[in-house]
UniProtKB/Swiss-Prot annotation:
Catalysed reaction, written as an equation: D-arabinose 5-phosphate + phosphoenolpyruvate + H2O = 3-deoxy-alpha-D-manno-2-octulosonate-8-phosphate + phosphate
Pfam families, per database record: DAHP_synth_1
GO MF terms held by the record: 3-deoxy-8-phosphooctulonate synthase activity
Annotated metabolic or biological route of this protein: Carbohydrate biosynthesis; 3-deoxy-D-manno-octulosonate biosynthesis; 3-deoxy-D-manno-octulosonate from D-ribulose 5-phosphate: step 2/3; Bacterial outer membrane biogenesis; lipopolysaccharide biosynthesis
InterPro entries hit by this protein: Aldolase_TIM, DAHP1/KDSA, KDO8P_synthase
Enzyme class: transferase
Name of the protein this chain belongs to: 2-dehydro-3-deoxyphosphooctonate aldolase
Species whose genome carries this gene: Francisella tularensis subsp. mediasiatica (strain FSC147)
Alphabetic keyword roster: Cytoplasm, Lipopolysaccharide biosynthesis, Transferase
Keyword rRNA-binding belongs to the record: no
Cited HAMAP family: KDO8P_synth
Documented EC number(s): 2.5.1.55
Length: 275
Protein backbone atom coordinates (compact mmCIF):
# COMPACT_ATOMS: atom_id res chain seq x y z
CA UNK A 1 0.00 0.00 0.00
CA UNK A 2 0.97 3.66 -0.30
CA UNK A 3 0.84 6.64 2.01
CA UNK A 4 1.02 9.83 -0.04
CA UNK A 5 3.97 9.17 -2.38
CA UNK A 6 5.77 6.30 -0.62
CA UNK A 7 5.29 2.55 -0.38
CA UNK A 8 4.61 0.82 2.93
CA UNK A 9 5.24 -2.84 3.75
CA UNK A 10 6.59 -5.72 1.67
CA UNK A 11 10.06 -5.37 3.15
CA UNK A 12 10.33 -1.63 2.47
CA UNK A 13 12.29 0.49 4.98
CA UNK A 14 10.25 1.49 8.02
CA UNK A 15 8.35 4.76 8.05
CA UNK A 16 7.80 7.03 11.05
CA UNK A 17 4.57 8.45 12.45
CA UNK A 18 5.52 11.12 14.97
CA UNK A 19 4.49 14.37 16.61
CA UNK A 20 2.92 15.58 19.85
CA UNK A 21 0.05 13.54 21.26
CA UNK A 22 -2.37 16.44 20.95
CA UNK A 23 -2.34 19.74 19.05
CA UNK A 24 -1.58 22.22 21.82
CA UNK A 25 -1.26 25.30 19.60
CA UNK A 26 -0.68 26.20 15.96
CA UNK A 27 2.82 27.48 16.68
CA UNK A 28 3.86 24.31 18.45
CA UNK A 29 2.42 22.15 15.68
CA UNK A 30 4.32 24.09 13.03
CA UNK A 31 7.56 24.03 15.02
CA UNK A 32 7.43 20.29 15.74
CA UNK A 33 6.38 19.38 12.21
CA UNK A 34 9.14 21.49 10.72
CA UNK A 35 11.80 19.98 12.95
CA UNK A 36 10.68 16.39 12.38
CA UNK A 37 10.33 16.93 8.63
CA UNK A 38 13.89 18.24 8.46
CA UNK A 39 15.31 15.40 10.57
CA UNK A 40 13.59 12.64 8.62
CA UNK A 41 14.52 14.22 5.28
CA UNK A 42 18.18 14.33 6.34
CA UNK A 43 18.02 10.66 7.37
CA UNK A 44 16.02 9.48 4.35
CA UNK A 45 13.15 8.16 6.47
CA UNK A 46 9.58 8.41 5.20
CA UNK A 47 7.58 10.52 7.65
CA UNK A 48 3.94 11.10 8.58
CA UNK A 49 3.19 13.94 11.01
CA UNK A 50 0.87 12.90 13.83
CA UNK A 51 -1.15 15.01 16.24
CA UNK A 52 -4.74 14.86 17.49
CA UNK A 53 -7.39 17.57 17.39
CA UNK A 54 -9.37 15.77 20.12
CA UNK A 55 -8.32 13.21 22.72
CA UNK A 56 -11.73 11.76 23.52
CA UNK A 57 -10.46 9.08 25.90
CA UNK A 58 -8.65 11.16 28.53
CA UNK A 59 -8.79 9.77 32.08
CA UNK A 60 -10.31 12.90 33.64
CA UNK A 61 -13.06 15.30 32.54
CA UNK A 62 -10.65 18.08 33.50
CA UNK A 63 -7.85 16.94 31.16
CA UNK A 64 -6.94 18.94 28.05
CA UNK A 65 -8.51 17.33 24.98
CA UNK A 66 -7.29 19.52 22.13
CA UNK A 67 -8.38 22.42 19.94
CA UNK A 68 -11.37 20.73 18.32
CA UNK A 69 -11.99 19.44 14.82
CA UNK A 70 -12.28 22.75 12.93
CA UNK A 71 -9.15 24.41 14.31
CA UNK A 72 -7.29 21.12 14.40
CA UNK A 73 -7.91 20.37 10.73
CA UNK A 74 -6.96 23.92 9.80
CA UNK A 75 -3.59 23.43 11.52
CA UNK A 76 -3.00 19.98 10.03
CA UNK A 77 -3.76 21.33 6.56
CA UNK A 78 -1.22 24.10 7.12
CA UNK A 79 1.40 21.58 8.29
CA UNK A 80 0.77 19.47 5.21
CA UNK A 81 1.03 22.41 2.80
CA UNK A 82 3.99 24.12 4.46
CA UNK A 83 6.25 21.10 4.91
CA UNK A 84 4.90 18.81 2.17
CA UNK A 85 4.43 15.90 4.57
CA UNK A 86 1.45 13.57 4.96
CA UNK A 87 -0.52 13.82 8.20
CA UNK A 88 -2.39 11.37 10.43
CA UNK A 89 -4.88 12.04 13.21
CA UNK A 90 -7.26 10.11 15.46
CA UNK A 91 -10.96 9.83 14.75
CA UNK A 92 -13.71 8.91 17.20
CA UNK A 93 -17.31 7.75 17.00
CA UNK A 94 -18.71 11.28 16.68
CA UNK A 95 -16.01 12.59 14.31
CA UNK A 96 -17.18 14.00 10.95
CA UNK A 97 -15.20 11.37 9.04
CA UNK A 98 -15.61 12.79 5.53
CA UNK A 99 -14.48 16.23 6.68
CA UNK A 100 -11.36 14.80 8.31
CA UNK A 101 -10.61 12.55 5.33
CA UNK A 102 -10.52 15.61 3.05
CA UNK A 103 -7.48 16.89 4.96
CA UNK A 104 -5.49 14.00 6.37
CA UNK A 105 -3.63 11.23 4.55
CA UNK A 106 -4.15 8.54 7.19
CA UNK A 107 -7.05 7.98 9.59
CA UNK A 108 -6.20 6.37 12.92
CA UNK A 109 -8.65 4.47 15.11
CA UNK A 110 -8.13 4.36 18.90
CA UNK A 111 -7.35 1.01 20.49
CA UNK A 112 -10.44 1.17 22.70
CA UNK A 113 -12.69 1.25 19.61
CA UNK A 114 -11.18 -1.58 17.55
CA UNK A 115 -14.16 -3.89 18.25
CA UNK A 116 -16.81 -1.29 17.38
CA UNK A 117 -17.94 -2.69 14.04
CA UNK A 118 -19.96 0.26 12.74
CA UNK A 119 -17.17 2.65 13.68
CA UNK A 120 -14.50 0.61 11.87
CA UNK A 121 -16.72 0.30 8.79
CA UNK A 122 -17.48 4.02 8.59
CA UNK A 123 -13.83 4.99 8.97
CA UNK A 124 -12.69 2.56 6.29
CA UNK A 125 -15.44 3.65 3.90
CA UNK A 126 -13.64 6.99 3.57
CA UNK A 127 -11.15 5.25 1.26
CA UNK A 128 -8.07 6.56 3.05
CA UNK A 129 -5.25 4.48 4.56
CA UNK A 130 -6.30 3.49 8.09
CA UNK A 131 -4.05 2.66 11.04
CA UNK A 132 -6.08 0.39 13.34
CA UNK A 133 -4.67 0.16 16.84
CA UNK A 134 -5.07 -3.21 18.52
CA UNK A 135 -7.01 -3.01 21.77
CA UNK A 136 -5.09 -3.48 24.99
CA UNK A 137 -7.55 -6.30 25.69
CA UNK A 138 -7.20 -8.11 22.36
CA UNK A 139 -5.10 -11.09 21.30
CA UNK A 140 -2.99 -10.40 18.21
CA UNK A 141 -4.64 -13.17 16.19
CA UNK A 142 -8.04 -11.59 16.84
CA UNK A 143 -6.98 -8.60 14.75
CA UNK A 144 -7.78 -10.75 11.71
CA UNK A 145 -11.48 -10.27 12.45
CA UNK A 146 -11.01 -6.51 12.66
CA UNK A 147 -9.11 -6.47 9.37
CA UNK A 148 -11.79 -8.58 7.68
CA UNK A 149 -14.42 -6.06 8.77
CA UNK A 150 -12.27 -3.18 7.55
CA UNK A 151 -11.57 -4.71 4.15
CA UNK A 152 -15.24 -5.63 3.65
CA UNK A 153 -15.69 -1.95 2.73
CA UNK A 154 -13.43 -2.40 -0.29
CA UNK A 155 -10.62 -0.47 1.36
CA UNK A 156 -7.41 -2.50 1.17
CA UNK A 157 -5.23 0.25 2.68
CA UNK A 158 -5.26 -1.08 6.23
CA UNK A 159 -2.44 -1.13 8.79
CA UNK A 160 -2.49 -2.83 12.19
CA UNK A 161 -0.75 -1.34 15.21
CA UNK A 162 0.50 -2.89 18.45
CA UNK A 163 0.41 -0.57 21.48
CA UNK A 164 0.81 -2.96 24.40
CA UNK A 165 -1.51 -5.32 26.24
CA UNK A 166 -3.01 -4.91 29.71
CA UNK A 167 -0.95 -6.58 32.42
CA UNK A 168 -2.96 -6.25 35.60
CA UNK A 169 -4.08 -2.80 36.72
CA UNK A 170 -2.41 0.40 35.43
CA UNK A 171 0.22 -1.45 33.42
CA UNK A 172 0.96 -2.59 29.88
CA UNK A 173 3.50 -5.00 28.45
CA UNK A 174 4.68 -5.46 24.87
CA UNK A 175 4.64 -8.99 23.48
CA UNK A 176 6.98 -8.86 20.50
CA UNK A 177 5.42 -12.08 19.18
CA UNK A 178 2.34 -9.97 18.46
CA UNK A 179 4.17 -8.09 15.70
CA UNK A 180 5.02 -11.31 13.89
CA UNK A 181 1.58 -12.82 14.47
CA UNK A 182 -0.20 -9.79 13.03
CA UNK A 183 1.81 -10.07 9.81
CA UNK A 184 -0.56 -12.94 9.01
CA UNK A 185 -3.31 -10.38 8.40
CA UNK A 186 -1.47 -9.35 5.25
CA UNK A 187 -1.40 -5.75 6.47
CA UNK A 188 1.61 -3.57 7.24
CA UNK A 189 2.44 -3.80 10.95
CA UNK A 190 3.15 -0.68 13.03
CA UNK A 191 4.60 -0.59 16.55
CA UNK A 192 3.49 2.20 18.89
CA UNK A 193 6.59 2.61 21.03
CA UNK A 194 5.32 5.39 23.28
CA UNK A 195 1.82 4.23 24.23
CA UNK A 196 3.33 0.81 24.92
CA UNK A 197 5.14 2.30 27.93
CA UNK A 198 2.04 4.07 29.21
CA UNK A 199 0.72 3.31 32.71
CA UNK A 200 -3.03 3.76 32.11
CA UNK A 201 -4.60 5.79 34.89
CA UNK A 202 -1.38 5.37 36.83
CA UNK A 203 -1.39 8.98 38.07
CA UNK A 204 -4.91 8.85 39.43
CA UNK A 205 -6.60 11.41 37.20
CA UNK A 206 -4.17 10.86 34.31
CA UNK A 207 -1.97 8.16 32.84
CA UNK A 208 1.62 7.67 33.86
CA UNK A 209 4.44 6.44 31.67
CA UNK A 210 7.96 5.07 31.56
CA UNK A 211 9.57 6.85 28.62
CA UNK A 212 12.98 5.41 29.55
CA UNK A 213 11.81 2.13 28.00
CA UNK A 214 10.85 3.62 24.61
CA UNK A 215 14.35 3.06 23.13
CA UNK A 216 14.63 -0.59 24.13
CA UNK A 217 11.13 -1.47 22.88
CA UNK A 218 11.70 0.41 19.62
CA UNK A 219 14.91 -1.52 18.98
CA UNK A 220 13.21 -4.81 19.83
CA UNK A 221 10.42 -4.03 17.37
CA UNK A 222 12.95 -3.25 14.65
CA UNK A 223 14.42 -6.71 15.19
CA UNK A 224 11.05 -8.18 14.20
CA UNK A 225 11.05 -6.27 10.92
CA UNK A 226 8.13 -3.90 11.42
CA UNK A 227 6.79 -1.71 8.63
CA UNK A 228 6.19 1.43 10.65
CA UNK A 229 7.09 3.03 13.96
CA UNK A 230 4.63 5.24 15.83
CA UNK A 231 6.39 7.43 18.39
CA UNK A 232 4.90 10.52 19.97
CA UNK A 233 7.40 13.31 20.55
CA UNK A 234 7.38 16.63 22.36
CA UNK A 235 9.90 19.48 22.70
CA UNK A 236 9.49 19.35 26.48
CA UNK A 237 7.69 16.14 27.52
CA UNK A 238 7.43 17.16 31.18
CA UNK A 239 5.27 20.11 30.14
CA UNK A 240 3.14 18.26 27.57
CA UNK A 241 -0.63 18.60 27.95
CA UNK A 242 -1.17 14.91 27.15
CA UNK A 243 0.98 11.77 27.49
CA UNK A 244 4.13 13.66 28.41
CA UNK A 245 5.41 10.89 30.65
CA UNK A 246 5.60 8.46 27.74
CA UNK A 247 6.63 10.91 25.00
CA UNK A 248 10.09 10.87 23.40
CA UNK A 249 12.11 14.11 23.81
CA UNK A 250 12.02 15.58 20.31
CA UNK A 251 15.50 17.05 20.27
CA UNK A 252 17.02 13.63 20.98
CA UNK A 253 15.24 11.93 18.14
CA UNK A 254 17.69 12.34 15.25
CA UNK A 255 20.50 10.23 16.70
CA UNK A 256 18.03 7.57 17.79
CA UNK A 257 16.32 7.38 14.40
CA UNK A 258 19.72 6.98 12.77
CA UNK A 259 20.33 3.91 14.93
CA UNK A 260 16.88 2.50 14.16
CA UNK A 261 17.47 2.95 10.44
CA UNK A 262 20.64 0.86 10.68
CA UNK A 263 18.83 -1.87 12.62
CA UNK A 264 15.95 -1.90 10.15
CA UNK A 265 18.31 -2.27 7.19
CA UNK A 266 20.26 -5.05 8.90
CA UNK A 267 17.17 -7.08 9.78
CA UNK A 268 15.47 -6.71 6.40
CA UNK A 269 18.64 -7.56 4.48
CA UNK A 270 18.88 -10.98 6.14
CA UNK A 271 16.98 -14.13 5.15
CA UNK A 272 14.20 -15.13 7.53
CA UNK A 273 14.99 -18.10 9.75
CA UNK A 274 12.28 -20.71 9.24
CA UNK A 275 11.69 -23.35 11.91
Amino acid sequence: MKIANFEVGNGKPFFLMSGPCVIESEQMAMDTAGYLAEVTKDLGINFVYKSSFDKANRSSINSFRGLGVDKGLEILAKVKKTYNVPVVTDVHEDTPFAEVAEVVDVLQTPAFLCRQTNFILEVCKQGKPVNIKKGQFLAPWDMQHVVTKAKSTGNEQIMVCERGVSFGYNNLVSDMRSLEIMKATGCPVVFDATHSVQLPGGQGSSSGGQREFVPVLSKAAMAVGIDGLFMETHPNPDEAKSDGLNSFPMYKIKEFLSLLKELDHLVKSQPKTEL
